[in-house]
Amino acid sequence: MFNFNEDRFVKVIEDALSLRVDLEKIIDDLYYKGFGNLFLIGVGGTYAHFLPIKYMSETLSTMPVHVVQAAEFILQNNKHFSKDSLCVFCSRSGDTKEIVEAITFCNKSGATTLSFVCNSGTPVCELSKYHFVSFAEDDHLAECIYLGMYSVIFRLLKNRGEFVEYEKMFDQINSIAPFLVKAKEQTEEMSKSLAKHHRNTDYHMVVGSGAVWGEAYDYAMCILEEMQWIKTKSIHAGEYFHGTIELTEEDTSIILLYGEDATRPLMDRVYNFASKISKEVAVFDTRTVELPVDEKYRQYLSPLVIYTMLERFSCHLEKERNHPLTT
């Protein structure tokens, strides 16, 4: 595969998975000590990657989970937040301004702070009551985040008696690395062709729903806009017909991200309409990917898998547009 280091990728996956035992001990301790609610506090991509976690929790649990934008959270006087809140953060660099400020704010309020970070010895590590370090660069960051966050959310639900199959699912997830490599391999040619075709396209729509809505938001803003400087709109499939439909034309690039949860009919509705109007509809679907988990668990892995697939498109866009993904 073009510009892909399999050994580096597999190491990111295995390092993230290796956090599970220590994470479980901390999560169990926090659960049995008791906490009022869970706050997932992010900015940019980390905010986006928290959205699927909230979606999953809402389908499985009555546990109060709040996903908030870090800068806004500090200013808004959120009445759900208190010293009894468990606050989770993620930062690749370890010095993200808004995250550092939010952790400081939570600490001053007496709340418990737990962070995932890719670089040790950074402010996020130093400020958080608990921190877990697992190195990743931007291209494989979401895999690292999701594998950590799955342990957090599903362990909490397991302790609440709302996800009793925790050990079974995670024993299967432990062997996921080669399946993610295969997902990239099977997406390679499509991604190469799509990137070549869209090398000069100046506007995209990215559509998602359910557990992959956060990835649609992330891909539009953090990859196509931030890293490729392409005007892009992320659209929830359920909202497409309430405005965006009017901008769909024959040459409109529409990238559909399909997960495997109950919201697939929303995506089908967009596809069935948009494909009659636009000749530029592309589909990335996690259902096409073989995974080592039981069918009923696949929906929870869909945001991780869609991110893994999209990395191939990003890599080829970088080449075709001669525009680095580090910008």
What are the residue ranges of the model-derived segments?
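Internal helical hairpin/lid segments
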Residues: 213-281
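Glycine-rich, charge-decorated loop segments at or immediately adjacent to ligand/cofactor-binding or catalytic sites
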Residues: 120-130, 244-247, 290-299
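Active-site phosphate/pyrophosphate-binding segments
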Residues: 2-37, 138-141, 154-235, 325-327
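Short basic, glycine-rich beta-strand/loop surfaces that mediate nucleic-acid
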Residues: 84-86, 249-258, 295-306, 310
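Aromatic-enriched
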Residues: 174, 282-286, 303
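Glycine-rich phosphate-binding loops that contact phosphosugars or nucleotide phosphates
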Residues: 31, 36-167, 209, 257-286
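Structural motif
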Residues: 21-26, 72-79, 241-244
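Structured C-terminal subdomain patch of bacterial secreted/periplasmic proteins
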Residues: 275-276, 287-325
